[in-house]
């Protein structure tokens, strides 16, 4: 039997915390149309992602993908750093 290929979910967001060891917090923002008023509203989600080499810093734009649960709240893994944050 041929098993169905499961597509891997990937998201792009901004790193808002890198204080944990090998873990980053990524803020995912999306725009949703209000069902009654029709205005587009920003909605956001914070996800914990696994960063094996601790390469991400606050403000970086990253791509993450879904993976097996690695901890109680961590089920995402870092794929790549899309854009580095500007150092001040």
Swiss-Prot record:
A GO term, aspect molecular function: rRNA binding
GO biological process, one term: translation
Official protein name in the record: Small ribosomal subunit protein uS17
Role summary: One of the primary rRNA binding proteins, it binds specifically to the 5'-end of 16S ribosomal RNA.
Pfam family, one: Ribosomal_S17
Keywords annotated in UniProt: Ribonucleoprotein, Ribosomal protein, RNA-binding, rRNA-binding
InterPro entries registered for this protein in UniProt: NA-bd_OB-fold, Ribosomal_uS17, Ribosomal_uS17_bact/chlr
A GO cellular component annotation in the UniProt record: cytosolic small ribosomal subunit
């Amino acid at each position: 039997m041929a098993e169905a290929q499961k597509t891997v979910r990937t998201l792009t967001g901004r790193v808002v915390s890198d204080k944990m060891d090998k873990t980053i917090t990524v803020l995912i923002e999306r725009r949703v149309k209000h069902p009654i008023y029709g205005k587009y509203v920003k909605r956001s989600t914070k996800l914990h992602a696994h960063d094996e080499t601790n390469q991400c810093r606050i403000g970086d734009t990253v791509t993450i993908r879904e993976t097996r649960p690695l901890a109680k709240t961590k089920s995402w893994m870092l794929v790549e750093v899309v854009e580095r944050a500007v150092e001040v």
